[in-house]
Amino acid sequence: MKIAIAQLYTKNLDDWAYIAVENKKRYARLNNYDLVSKRGLYKTKPKRHPSWHSLSLILEILETSNIDWVFWSDVDALIMDYTVKLESFMKPNCDIIIPSQGQGEYCGIKTNNCLCCGHYFIKNTQWSKDFLRHLWKWPKDEYDRYRNYGYWEQCGMNYMFNENEMDFDKHVYIEPKNRAFNSFYYQEPDKQAMEFSQWGEGWFRTKESEKGLEKDLGTAYNEGDFIVHFAGKHCIPQRKKLMQEYSEKIKWN
């Protein structure tokens, strides 16, 4: 089985993106995976937020290589446990494996599962390629604003899920444990003041979600988790420092 890790970033992230590139390069080399790190965007009309370009990169890999699976990984994340194999998350009868952040209202849609595009697996099948094209075409008419607003392609992914577009439920496995491969870095308010409204994800940072940590649920990074994801406005001022710090904590064996 051939697996590729894919990530994309723009030059304004150069100050710290190299840390993630090196982190995943070492992990890929150790586990015999390919790594595709693209710096820059594809030409699109009209213009879209860089997050949308992840779809173009994944589709390019699927169409031009013999890769069996692509693991998309946002560039603001680090792999913390090099002993964990990507194969351990595979579901052979699925085309996409994507984690759920939990229940809440997302992009104006009430949902029992908010799917997160920060990290997910996609299999090299015709359905997957058709789905990526379909998702790319989604932001039009009343959804046109999501080309550059909100959570971009993730809003589209959740729309596809809630509307069961392209028989979504028959092709996609929803990983109930977001922390399986997408743990968010989070500091308690007494350590660093933060308003949840700044990045709109307060509903999965509630006291109720903290109870789920005992069952490996919830979304916040805990020591020993596979990946730490430095997403959100609260991370922006300290992202480079955090990534340098956590790069020294990787489990190699």
Regions found by a protein language model. Name each.
Residues I5, A28, I58, D76, ...:
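A residue-level signal for conserved active-site and pocket-lining positions in enzyme catalytic cores
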Residues Q7-Y9, I98, H229:
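Short beta-strand/turn micro-motifs composed of small residues
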Residues M1-I67, Q126, N253:
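N-terminal anchoring/stem segment of glycosyltransferases
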Residues K47-L132:
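GT-A fold catalytic core of metal-dependent nucleotide-sugar glycosyltransferases
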Residues T10-N12, Y42-K43, A77-L78, G102-E105, ...:
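Short, solvent-exposed loop/turn segments at secondary-structure junctions
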Residues Y18-A20, K25-R29, Y33, K38, ...:
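The feature represents the membrane-entry module of six-transmembrane cation channels
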Residues S56, W127-N253:
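Catalytic core and acceptor-binding pocket of nucleotide-sugar-dependent glycosyltransferases
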Residues L13-A17, K47-S51, I109-N113, F121-N124, ...:
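Aromatic-acidic/polar surface patches that form glycan- and anion
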